[in-house]
Amino acid sequence: MNFGFLGTILTILLVVGFITNVVLAFVIIFLERDRRTASSTWAWLFVLFVLPVIGFILYLFLGRTVSKKKMEKNNGDELNAFEDLVQDQIDSFDKHNYGYINDQVIKHRDLIRMLLMKQDAFLTENNKIDLFTDGHKLYEKVLEDIYNAQDYIHLEYYTFELDGLGKRILDALETKLKEGLEVKLLYDDVGSKKVRLSKFKHFRALGGEVEAFFPSKVPLINFRMNNRNHRKIIIIDGQIGYVGGFNVGDDYLGLGKLGYWRDTHTRVQGEGIDALQLRFILDWNSQSHRPQFKFDQKYFPKKIGDKGNAAIQIASSGPAFDLHQIEYGYTKMIMSAKKSIYLQSPYFIPDQSYINALKMAANSGVEVNLMIPCKPDHPFVYWATFSNAADLLDSGVNIYTYQNGFIHSKILMIDDEISSIGSANMDFRSFELNFEVNAFIYDEDIAKQLRQAFEKDIEQSKLLTKEVYDKRPLSIKFKEGLAKLISPIL
């Protein structure tokens, strides 16, 4: 064997790898600086130079960003009416001409105005909201609503598995297609990795439309592992909407290896559905190769049926957005809290400013409660979550680890007044990389229901104490340290 020749080849590969990494470092530092945080930049530089070849491969899958132009294609002037509505609402807050009947709207007008800086986060009142924390009860209602649909059904999901639950929903959708209804389904290509468009042959033959979000251009490999559509939305006839944390699949009914699945989802009736419909149309048009999906009046009908008193803003965020609205909304809520904060997130990897906000709240006398899982579904993410949560112990934050299965709920509630429920975790991936949607709800009844659900969860959780945390073995300390170091790219 010619070891000299092999050595030469290896040297050439290492030199090429080093030069490639230098070029990528230049791109990350100078060409993508407006799309990355400092922590993300440093994390990628660390990976590139510590792991020259592997770092390049990781960058291909995880490091690239998405352009705003790509996400806004096919929408043209259709957004003008919504932009005018948002501007009118901003003007009303600036001029103190409120005209709103909800007391929490006036009290939290600063948060509302901030969220209005995105065209789809307009404020609506008179919404009726139902909360779901159990997958079986949620999808029983979803299936009932699908079978009662009269005009159209739109679904957008990060994970849409074609297992027991997925097939039941697909069967219901195909039944409605046979009745002549319009049905559109948008799923994420990575989140629904077991699903391919070919699986929907019968659905499409019946007239159903389906699109994959950022599909792979190479069989079996998707080079865009980041920038995924993590949203979970259903709109039925413009009268009923769903948004929250549950995906579609048997795992979310508690039938997977993680056991019982604890999540939070909302069913909305009222004007807030228009914002969900807008979000769906924008996302569909960004991925579809068909003619533009028009903002037809039938998708924004006059609302009928039960009306409630809840005010809602539907806030979206993603890598193509100028402002990280959901992250800003979370932080503003924390800084506004006077009495209590209730947080649930399966992944807790925010930046230091977010952690500092929680510390300041706790040190100011606000009761701060955070609930995270007791078991990992992604090991590195779990150890980073555990480390970040424990960082709050010295400030008096109550940290609970949920024991009854896996908690996937993403909620923030303050002062028994306002809350946020949706798809966004409290981590860098949700704040910076993925496309997310959350409902910011200004309603005391919903806030109190969330607190009661949280208190029920405490009964099936363990309180993490400083004494217990300090006794963790060296192996766990090592895992936490490594996970925290690379957390900006997890």
From Swiss-Prot:
Listed GO biological process terms: cardiolipin biosynthetic process
Active site: H230, K232, D237, H408, K410, D415
Top enzyme class: transferase
EC numbers on record: 2.7.8.-
This protein's record includes keyword Lipid biosynthesis: yes
Entries under InterPro entries matching the protein: Cardiolipin_synth_Firmi, Cardiolipin_synthase, CLS_N, PLD-like_dom, PLipase_D/transphosphatidylase
Membrane topology per record: Multi-pass membrane protein
Signal peptide location: none
PANTHER family: CARDIOLIPIN SYNTHASE, PHOSPHOLIPASE D
Protein name: Cardiolipin synthase 1
Organism classification: Bacteria, Bacillati, Bacillota, Bacilli, Bacillales
Name of the encoding gene: cls1
